[in-house]
Amino acid sequence: MMKPLNAPHRWGQALLLLCTLALGGCMSSAKSVPSRYSLAFDADRQVNAAAGQRPAPIKLRVLLLRSSAEFMDADFFSLQNDAKGVLGNSLLDSDQFFLTPGQIGKKLAGQATLDARYIGIIAEYQNLDGKAWRITLPLPEPTETNFYKVWQFSPDELEAHIVAGINGLRTVNDED
């Protein structure tokens, strides 16, 4: 003959079942989440000034890249005229805008794709001689989400401050 379960034992089983069901509701399948980026752009007051002339607006192109190799190997005019043809499958997305001389605080933020590993930036100076007209910024690796949403973390984010100066593009550390 079986002994009846005592009340504390039943409550323990009920609590265990309730916890199991509650955690099951928080479960999701693990997946990769692309990194995010937040870029701030400034332009020097004398940016894009040709010899003896006034400063002029400068066009910037921001490229989301699978690889930086093709970008760094290409010449300026090829990238300017046919970025898609030159970069091929390495180019995932692009954006462009102008900065006026002395402009500060232009923001560009977004989420990369899972394949994106770099952001390439091109500055279209009137005179390229000796200027750093391109830079690349490595993106954080995509984040693997956790099995339980209770412990979910946000993907890493690239934060960068880029200045279009008289000698070319450069990144600055805002903590200085």
Regions found by a protein language model. Name each.
Residues 22-25:
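C-terminal motif of bacterial Sec signal peptides marking the signal peptidase cleavage site
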Residues 116-126:
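A short, solvent-exposed beta-strand micro-motif common in secreted/extracellular proteins
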